[in-house]
Amino acid sequence: MSNGKITQVIGPVIDVEFEAGELPEIYYALKVSNPSLGDEPWNLVAEVAQHLGENTVRAIAMDSTDGLVRGQEVLNTGRQISVPVGRGTLGRILNVIGEPVDEQGPVETDTTWEIHRPTPEFVDQSTKVEAFETGIKVVDLLAPYARGGKIGLFGGAGVGKTVLIMELIHNIAKKHGGFSVFAGVGERTREGNDLWNEMKESNVLDKTALVYGQMNEPPGARARVALSALTVAEYFRDQENQDVLLFVDNIFRFTQAGSEVSALLGRIPSAVGYQPTLSTEMGELQERITTTKNGSITSVQAIYVPADDLTDPAPATTFAHLDATTVLSRQIAELGIYPAVDPLDSSSRILDPQVLGEEHYQVARDVQYVLQRYKDLQDIIAILGMDELSEEDKQTVSRARKIQRFLSQPFHVAEIFTGTPGKYVELSETIRGFKEIVEGKHDSVPEQAFYMAGGIDEVLENAAKMAS
């Protein structure tokens, strides 16, 4: 295989000329020495994105291109970007090309897998449906997650997507004990660091592989880091027959990175300036996240919603792939109710009596009915006040406000900020608590007792303390 030479550098994109008949294939990794990154040779990896003709390829760099010059030699590796897979990745932080960035020495695995992989065959996919308990009341009751499903956490800036993801990792590692893979795609480095320290303190790090491509990295790294993390998860599913959890924070940044390089690759932008290949790229990633007969990948994806607009092409394209959506609402966060999950906007494909059982389904629907009725009455209350409502409506409003507060819950991972110990609430406790509120058993309990409590028994303890 012959080497090529750089003919042009445009931001994160480089053009490389090879000899006739020696062109690397699309997605192949190229290597070049970038003195600004360090002294080691071939320290910058780029991925071939286009064949331009005249023996030239256009490649997207996975790190800074500052310091590259025309005429520099480029190595064709003859294969795609490959990342280490297997148990050696647990407890480690990798970057997009599979190198450890936690200063803990090399990753000890025997196997590497290429990051662009085919989707599992249709016949290998499993169709069994079962719910997956998270210990978070609002999620388990109203928008339950399916094992092997895809879950989207929608929310604008600062409503608590990352905290919710960290709590899910905590609860699942403690209760479920399976392996998790966390893909940090274009988010804050501080949050990545916090997550690592948090996991270390709560002893879940040895069950988790972390793959980071943060906000400060070039778009090439942010557009590929989700695939690197997914490849690590696929190994556990396919080779070790595990039920794996894949957390992606944030899937919007994957789309955003694609749109940053799209114009440099000469593609004509589509709606709102996004890349024309938006749904194809999203489909290639999402279709690999699935349950096979060997094991499953359950994925929880935080989805930033630009300007709180759910019809923006990036969140709208992601919607099509999801089994459950957990929508975080700024209005609920403003009321001081955390997790700020919107109980009426969030939905799940498995909220069905045949999957969850009749009692769970009925309680969930009753809770939604009471909350919806309260929402409908809010205009009347705002204009005429509570006194104009019928006795029945007053009772509905009172119960709805209790339900709203009971949907809040103290988190383990927020304990250091709030000083309140976190609570994991079993599904049976959640159903019992909400059923009793809807049936009117706690109409005499003050609504403040329901705020930031775990199960219904804790609410009654709070009420007793308030009374004394």
From Swiss-Prot:
Its main location: membrane. SMART domains: AAA. ATP binds at residues 155-162. It is a peripheral membrane protein. Keywords: ATP synthesis, ATP-binding, Cell inner membrane, Cell membrane, CF(1), Hydrogen ion transport, Ion transport, Membrane, Nucleotide-binding, Translocase, Transport. Signal peptide: none annotated. GO terms for molecular function: ATP binding; ATP hydrolysis activity; proton-transporting ATP synthase activity, rotational mechanism. It catalyses: ATP + H2O + 4 H(+)(in) = ADP + phosphate + 5 H(+)(out). The keyword Translocase applies. GO terms for cellular component: plasma membrane; proton-transporting ATP synthase complex. Its EC number is 7.1.2.2. It is found in: Cell inner membrane. It holds the Pfam family ATP-synt_ab_N. The keyword Signal does not apply. It is an enzyme of class 7 (translocase). F-type ATPases have 2 components, CF(1) - the catalytic core - and CF(0) - the membrane proton channel. CF(1) has five subunits: alpha(3), beta(3), gamma(1), delta(1), epsilon(1). CF(0) has three main subunits: a(1), b(2) and c(9-12). The alpha and beta chains form an alternating ring which encloses part of the gamma chain. CF(1) is attached to CF(0) by a central stalk formed by the gamma and epsilon chains, while a peripheral stalk is formed by the delta and b chains. NCBIfam families: atpD (TIGR01039). Produces ATP from ADP in the presence of a proton gradient across the membrane. The catalytic sites are hosted primarily by the beta subunits. PANTHER family: ATP SYNTHASE, ATP SYNTHASE SUBUNIT BETA, MITOCHONDRIAL. Belongs to the ATPase alpha/beta chains family. This is ATP synthase subunit beta 1. It comes from Syntrophotalea carbinolica (strain DSM 2380 / NBRC 103641 / GraBd1).
